[in-house]
Amino acid sequence: MEGRRFAAVLILPICMLAPGAVASKRWTRPSVCNLPAESGTGTQSLKRFYYNSDKMQCRTFIYKGNGGNDNNFPRTYDCQKKCLYRPG
């Protein structure tokens, strides 16, 4: 009986800490993904991708070549890698 009580005393604090340990590893979307698409300035017409936080997906827009913000990716893969949560 004494052995069981000892095991319970050791296991209980570990179980109480586990939820906090998991919560601290929550994934949060980078703030750049919340920026609006900005065409920038210039004369080019480049197809780029931005993360649309309302639709929760990467969408295309036309980038003019200069300026804008960092929610601007050359490939849809780059946008998804940065802004879409992938468990595992």
Curated annotation (Swiss-Prot):
InterPro entries referenced in this protein's UniProt entry, alphabetically: Kunitz_BPTI, Kunitz_BPTI_sf, TFPI/VKTCI-like
The organism's place on the tree of life at top rank: Eukaryota
Domain BPTI/Kunitz inhibitor residues, every copy: 33-83
Tissue-by-tissue expression: Expressed by the venom duct.
Disulfide-bonded cysteines: C33-C83, C58-C79
Subcellular location: Secreted
Chief location bin: secreted
Keywords, alphabetical: Amidation, Disulfide bond, Ion channel impairing toxin, Neurotoxin, Potassium channel impairing toxin, Protease inhibitor, Secreted, Serine protease inhibitor, Signal, Toxin, Voltage-gated potassium channel impairing toxin
Gene3D superfamilies (UniProt xref): Pancreatic trypsin inhibitor Kunitz domain
PTM (free text): Contains 2 disulfide bonds instead of 3, as for all Kunitz domain proteins.
Pfam families: Kunitz_BPTI
Keyword Repeat part of the UniProt annotation: no
Annotated Gene Ontology cellular component terms: extracellular space
Metal-binding in keyword set: no
Any GO MF annotation of the entry: toxin activity
UniProt signal peptide: 1-23
Residues carrying Proline amide: P87
Family, similarity comment: Belongs to the venom Kunitz-type family.
Function: Blocks specifically voltage-activated potassium channels (Kv) of the Shaker family.
Protein name: Kunitz-type conkunitzin-B1
Organism from which the protein derives: Conus bullatus
